[in-house]
Design a protein with these regions (language model features):
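Secondary-structure boundary elements
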Residues: 276-422, 426, 430
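Short glycine/proline/serine/threonine-rich loop/turn segments at secondary-structure transition edges
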Residues: 237-245, 678-690, 784-791
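Contiguous beta-strand segments within globular domains
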Residues: 145-191, 228, 612-624, 633, ...
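Short acidic/proline- and small/hydrophobic-mixed sequence motifs that coincide with surface turns
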Residues: 184, 630-634, 742-747
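Hydrophobic/aromatic-rich core segments of domains that either
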Residues: 28-29, 381-518
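Short beta-strand elements
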Residues: 253-299, 699-729, 801-826, 830-831
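Intrinsically disordered, low-complexity Pro/Gly/Ser/Thr-rich segments with frequent PxxP/GP/PP motifs
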Residues: 652-681, 759-783
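Extended acidic/polar, glycine-enriched regions
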Residues: 179, 183-186, 190-295
């Protein structure tokens, strides 16, 4: 039956995705709200062969909508796209005008584009130019980064020659005419996007000069001087974003003329956080500078007690990145009519940054085996990833949460959405929609791993983007969570958000999109269940402050860390916070979980781990305090295992048991030393370990349970700039690294990247001996002036998560030429560094 529908609807490629098709056709409103039972994480997939591009149909005008388009309301929607995009579309590379490829040699230089000239066509279509006809002999879109357009629209940093503007804001252009402009002449500007532009969908925009257009579009003559016409063009604050074809029509007594399409006259239109009429408007200039224009940022990882930070090169203005971002929308087959809606666009991006369902940008891999790609810890920015996807059409291996989030920040900032990268420490992954983290133990309080499907990630990274939510009741505008890491499905697709942070804070899990899942990540409780003699399970302990313990992002205007936990949840333990948790849990799969709470506690337990560098011995300890007026006997059991940052644990490699006698009001500490040789064979990514502590108080029957995650720190790379940095002039940087391990690091790879400084560069340095120090020197040529950041990383099978950064203040070139012409040089990708040039010490 499924095959019949596929054939009848004429949907190529749908046969291989019957589940997605049936989900889109049959899922009810419940699936629109959140992730009510999805697929588990899938293993890394092999990229599919690059599909052959279809013939270019961008100039097609006529024709009706297809049967599928007539059935699907989202294909003609102007402002709000459907949240279910149905089956995976066929590849649309090379078909539309929203992404496309750039002409050879276009590297974002600051030279002004020559005006376009063409014979044009008259009304008869025979190319004859009659005497007296008003012919457009050239167009100057004033697209140079030094021109007023790019400066006023805050797009002067994009390494592109074409005009890039933000919607809802006027721009200027010049028309060169064959004769003097007369009041009886009529001039019409036209913008077209997509394969089948239609006025009703907003994909064919007609702007009569001197008259008001529809939806906020208009054009005015500001100056007429001889055969030159100065125009001021106003775009709609609700305009579709993308790359538009541009043409001009004229009409006079002598006939009509149309300027031919010219790739040099294509216009990019983006969202506009500076425009009050745009629903992405941000009313703080310092926010816009940070969340739209900043090309680098900090991403936080590790554990709450041992926070690590790394600098990430977003590179949203680098040559080719804007085309890659628009290609992502094309590849998903997103209807052009929905591309003016940031809710729909951000939801598509959350689906397309991961490769599941739709062969998106990044392949997720949490296995620890990255031999067929790049270790997620080795990436230093988004540029290399996005350009690879644009160039090949293949999903890029591999990513984990911070990589997905870093790429998402790049894409959304590039398209004009104020976006930041957010880290949640002790982030829950609720698999059964109970909105609680359920941990099961046997009669002796040993974890039952086969039942523990819920997990708590040491940290999880996602994105906040700023927009109004006209699809929700009032009060839910502002920051919206978008999460591109594929964890659970939403409406049958691996995507998440946008979800109002305000709805998360108050436990309003019925608000779309995906609020139940995100609420559980930040504000669920840990519920400990113990197996009884009859095989049933009983709640023995509820840990209320274990999830979402710290939520942070980079501070505005500095590299400091900003605590934004208060935006996501009320103060822990407050009446408002408890009400939010219980409201959310009432909508989950275990609504009565709080009906039977445990007895009072009089013995407190605190778990600690020594802050150690990888390669050192360490110590873990448990502090017990008796708050009662009677003696207490505590039987304690400690289990130590390694853990992935996702909460997936390895086998227990060390444990100890202890019985402690506590006098009234007394405290005692239980310690367990751990040697490097004990944990070395078991280490996995991030160097994290999980200490499970369980026990009970003999006299009162109180159950003690605690899970404590900690990590081993890795060293940083030391970067030093050798000399001044000037646009267009070679500069040198020194990188120093000391191996902290007593073992040899093999197949060591360095990565170097920085927007405006260095295109992504890979350096293969071979082996580094145990405790050896190496020094590398690398040259680069800055291409843009101003404060920049050069970022480096090191990766090897024995050690990862090693990185460093240096601030580089680049002076303008003599004569202030702006962009240097070699902005897109990729010639150093994959360089092998000879041993003699490493400067080993």
């Amino acid at each position: 039956m499924e095959g019949f529908w596929v054939s009848w609807l004429g949907l190529p490629g749908l046969r291989s995705h019957p589940r997605l098709f049936l989900t889109g056709m049959m899922d009810g409103p419940r699936s629109d709200v959140g992730r009510w039972g999805g697929n588990p994480l899938q293993p890394p997939t092999t990229p599919s062969p690059e599909p052959e591009p279809e013939p270019d149909r961008r100039f097609r005008r006529g024709g009706g909508r297809s049967f599928w388009a007539r059935c699907c309301g989202c294909c003609s929607c102007r402002n709000v796209a459907d949240d279910d995009w149905g089956p995976e579309p066929s590849d649309s590379r090379g078909r539309g005008s929203s992404s496309g490829t750039r002409r050879p040699g276009s590297r974002g230089s600051d030279s002004r584009q020559p005006v376009s000239r063409g014979s044009g066509v008259n009304a008869a279509g025979d190319g004859t130019i009659r005497e007296g006809m008003l012919v457009v002999t050239g167009v100057d879109l004033l697209s140079s980064r030094s021109d007023q357009n790019r400066q006023e629209h805050h797009t002067d940093e994009y390494e592109y020659d074409e005009l890039i503007v933000r919607r809802g804001q006027p721009f200027r252009m010049l028309l060169l005419l064959s004769r003097t402009y007369e009041s009886s002449d009529r001039i019409t500007l036209e913008l077209l996007i997509g394969n089948n532009p239609e006025v009703g969908k907003g994909t064919h925009v007609i702007i009569p000069v001197g008259k008001g257009g529809s939806g906020g579009w208009k054009a005015q003559v500001t100056k007429a001087s001889g055969q030159t016409l100065n125009l001021r063009v106003h775009t709609s604050p609700n305009a579709i974003i993308g790359k538009f074809q541009f043409t001009v029509r004229t009409q006079s007594d002598a006939g009509e003329f149309q300027l031919p399409f010219d790739p040099r006259n294509e216009i990019y239109i983006l969202f506009n956080p500076w425009c009050p009429e745009d629903i992405v408007y941000v009313d703080h200039e310092d926010w816009r500078q940070e969340y739209v224009l900043n090309e680098s940022g900090r991403i936080y990882y590790g554990t709450e007690a041992q926070i690590g930070e790394r600098t990430w090169n977003y590179g949203q203005f680098d040559h080719g990145v804007l085309d890659a971002c628009l290609y992502i929308l094309d590849r998903r087959g997103m209807p052009y009519g929905g591309r003016g809606d940031p809710v729909s666009v951000s939801r598509v991006i959350s689906a397309m940054v991961n490769s599941l369902d739709d062969n998106g940008v990044l392949i997720g891999n949490w296995s620890g085996d990255y031999s067929r790609g790049t270790n997620p810890s080795a990436w230093v920015g988004s540029v290399e990833i996005l350009l690879s996807y644009l160039r090949t059409g293949y999903s890029v291996p591999y990513g984990q949460c911070w990589v997905f989030a870093g790429v998402t920040t790049t894409v959304l900032r590039c398209l004009g959405l104020a976006t930041r990268t957010v880290t949640n420490f002790n982030s829950a992954h609720d698999t059964d929609t109970s909105l609680t983290m359920d941990i099961y133990f046997d009669e002796n309080m040993k974890p039952l791993e086969h039942l523990n499907h819920d997990s708590v990630w040491n940290f999880h990274v996602w994105n906040d983007c700023w927009m109004k939510r006209p699809d929700l009741p009032s009060g839910f505008d502002g920051w919206q969570v978008v999460d591109a890491t594929p964890q659970e499905t939403s409406s049958g697709i691996f995507c998440c958000g946008p979800c109002s942070v305000e709805s998360i804070k108050n436990g309003l899990v019925y608000m779309k999109y995906d609020t139940p899942f995100i609420f559980a990540e930040v504000n669920s409780d840990k519920v400990y269940w113990q197996r009884q003699d009859d095989g049933s399970f009983k709640i023995v302990y509820v840990e209320e402050k274990a999830i979402g313990t710290l939520i942070v992002t980079k501070a505005i205007g500095s590299n400091m860390r900003e605590d934004i936990t208060y935006l996501y949840k009320h103060p822990e333990g407050s009446d408002a916070e408890r009400k939010a948790v219980e409201t959310a849990a009432a909508h989950g799969s275990k609504p009565n979980v709080y009906a039977n709470r445990g007895s009072a506690e009089d013995v407190a337990m605190q778990v600690e781990a020594q802050d150690a560098v990888m390669g050192q011995d360490l110590m873990v300890s448990v502090m017990l305090t008796n708050h009662s007026s009677s003696r207490r006997t505590v039987k304690l059991h400690l289990y130590l295992s390694v853990t992935f940052y996702t909460g997936v644990t390895g086998t227990i490699f060390k444990e100890t048991k202890k019985e402690v006698e506590l006098a009234p009001g007394a405290s005692d500490r239980v310690t367990m030393p751990v040697a490097y040789k004990e944990y070395r064979p078991h280490l996995v990514d991030q160097g994290a370990m999980l200490l499970n502590v369980s026990g009970h108080v003999k006299e009162s029957g109180q159950v003690l349970a605690k899970q404590h995650t900690f990590r081993l720190r890795t060293p940083d790379l030391s970067l030093t700039l050798l000399g001044a940095a000037v646009v267009g002039q070679e500069c040198e940087v020194q990188i120093v690294f000391k191996n902290p391990l007593p073992v040899t690091l093999t197949n060591v790879v360095f990565r170097l990247e920085g927007s405006g400084l260095q295109r992504p560069k890979i350096l293969n340095v071979g082996d580094i001996g145990g405790n050896e120090t190496v020094t590398l020197r690398q040259t680069f040529v800055p291409v843009r002036p101003g404060p920049r950041q050069l970022i480096a990383s090191l990766d090897s099978p024995q050690l990862s998560q090693v990185h460093g950064v240096i601030q580089v203040d680049v002076a303008p070139a003599p004569g202030d030429r702006g962009f240097f012409s070699d902005a897109g040089d990729d010639s150093h990708l994959g360089e092998t560094i000879p041993m003699a040039s490493r400067g080993g010490a």
